[in-house]
């Protein structure tokens, strides 16, 4: 068996407007599909950034993770050209970031920030 690549990653968010503002308007994802699913009482968004697809289920009644170190998805990481410049851009959009760190395993700069539902997101050179 040979797996070619990751096709998509799925996250669950609570608020449609916040999700669109954050992922589309601020982070630059494109909406490729949007479906309101009455049977599941949610909205399914398929977003794209480069070759990567992010599938988002907007479920207003979804519980939040109590803390990030639970079993399952820990965080999403995005590769960027320049962490320092990206941090400035995020901060200008009103998105708080942690201090920039040096990843001793990769030899690259990186830091974290959170989406509106507190999902940790990483930028990494």
Protein language model regions, located:
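Short, conserved charged micro-motifs
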Residues: 83-87
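Conserved beta-strand-loop-alpha-helix junction that forms the acyl-donor binding cleft
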Residues: 13-15, 38-39
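Short hydrophobic/aromatic beta-strand micro-patches
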Residues: 10-12, 77-79
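Conserved active-site tyrosine of GNAT-family acetyltransferases
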Residues: 19-24, 90, 118
């Amino acid at each position: 068996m040979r797996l070619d690549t990751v096709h998509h990653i799925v996250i669950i968010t609570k608020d449609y407007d916040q999700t669109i503002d954050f992922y589309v308007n601020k982070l630059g994802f494109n909406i490729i599909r949007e479906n309101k699913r009455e049977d599941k009482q949610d909205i399914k968004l398929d977003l794209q950034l480069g070759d990567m697809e992010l599938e988002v289920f907007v479920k207003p009644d979804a519980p939040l993770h109590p803390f990030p170190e639970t079993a399952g998805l820990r965080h999403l990481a995005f590769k960027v050209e320049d962490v320092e410049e990206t941090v400035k851009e995020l901060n200008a959009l009103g998105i708080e970031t942690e201090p920039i760190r040096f990843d001793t395993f990769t030899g690259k700069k990186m830091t974290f920030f959170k989406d509106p539902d507190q999902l940790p997101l990483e930028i990494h050179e």
